[in-house]
Amino acid sequence: ENPDCKITSVSQNDNQNYCKCEKCAAVDEEEGSHAGSLLRFVNRVADEIKDDYPDVSIDTLAYQYTRKAPLITKPRDNVIIRLCSIECCFAHGLNDPDCEVNAAFKHDIIEWGKISKRLYIWDYVTDFTYYIPPFPNWRVLRENLEFFADNHAAGMYPEGNYNSVSGEFGELRAYLLARAMWDPYMSDDEMNSY
């Protein structure tokens, strides 16, 4: 129906209702993560389509209960892992040694980066709890972009203003993030020129 589609998603639902049958539970126990059963399924789909659709990739979320990388199964070359940072603290950088909330995600991105050739990040770039007031986390966003690049992230989706006219300077934040994604290591002077 859409021959130009190059990425299609096979992902979990946006909830905590994962399969608890005996077989899936055994796989997840062996893998040390609920991502084990999901990734084995996604890999089978990827294997089925690779000959007929060699330019198409399967995208799947590493999100909430599947965020932790599996111990055994690795994503196929035509599988994209989209690691979501929803549980993180967005006022502190992922490398901040004083932020215990971000420590688990930091570990997860490092582990996914070791096994995935195509790691993308779904990052949350504003404060959804207090959406409209100023949330000056630009320094954190810049640090995190560098951290993502250092840990083999090949793409990023920054979710910010999605449900109202705008949060704090939403359009400017989106523009600056777009510029920074082209070069996550650009200097502050370069960034300030935009």
Please describe what each predicted stretch is.
Residues P184, D189-S193:
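Carbohydrate-binding surfaces of carbohydrate-active enzymes
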Residues E1-Y185:
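Catalytic-core regions of glycoside hydrolase
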Residues I81, S193-Y194:
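Generic structural signal marking isolated hydrophobic packing positions
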